[in-house]
């Protein structure tokens, strides 16, 4: 009995420490369905954004700092599979970026720094064969 009480107390303590975000509908489709939601911290700063297809399936989601993308962002195909993953810092693409085709094969992969291509980039055809490679200056 003591173990259950201790476990329950720990769950409530953890839940109380978890930051609560306020969710607001930012945009809607003409039919009234949600197109974009934003999540705000206690200070009123937008910290996450989620965009939806008209079906309600998540189209894109990621972190925000105010009005700029910040952190990991993922885009999804209408069936829910991941289409792309990338990172933003202060609204600019930074770090590794990977994009897949609807058949699951890679489309492109490479790196960004402050919004521009850097380093080695690769592009693939629909069958996953390497089409081209480009080396961008750091």
Put a short name on every predicted segment.
Residues 4-13:
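Sec-dependent N-terminal signal peptides
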Residues 17-77, 81-89, 93-101, 105-113, ...:
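Periodic aromatic/glycine/histidine/acidic cluster detector
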């Amino acid at each position: 009995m003591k173990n259950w009480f201790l476990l329950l107390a720990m769950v409530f303590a953890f839940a109380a420490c978890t930051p609560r975000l306020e969710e607001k509908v930012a945009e809607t489709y003409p039919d009234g369905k949600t197109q974009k939601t934003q999540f705000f911290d206690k200070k009123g700063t937008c910290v996450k954004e989620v965009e939806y297809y008209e079906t309600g399936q998540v189209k894109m989601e990621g972190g925000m700092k105010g009005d700029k993308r910040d952190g990991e962002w993922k885009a999804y195909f209408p069936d829910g599979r991941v289409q792309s993953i990338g990172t933003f810092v202060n609204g600019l693409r930074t770090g590794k970026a990977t994009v897949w085709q609807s058949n699951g094969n890679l489309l492109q992969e490479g790196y960004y720094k402050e919004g521009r291509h850097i380093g080695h980039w690769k592009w693939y055809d629909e069958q996953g064969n390497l089409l081209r490679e480009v080396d961008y200056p750091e």
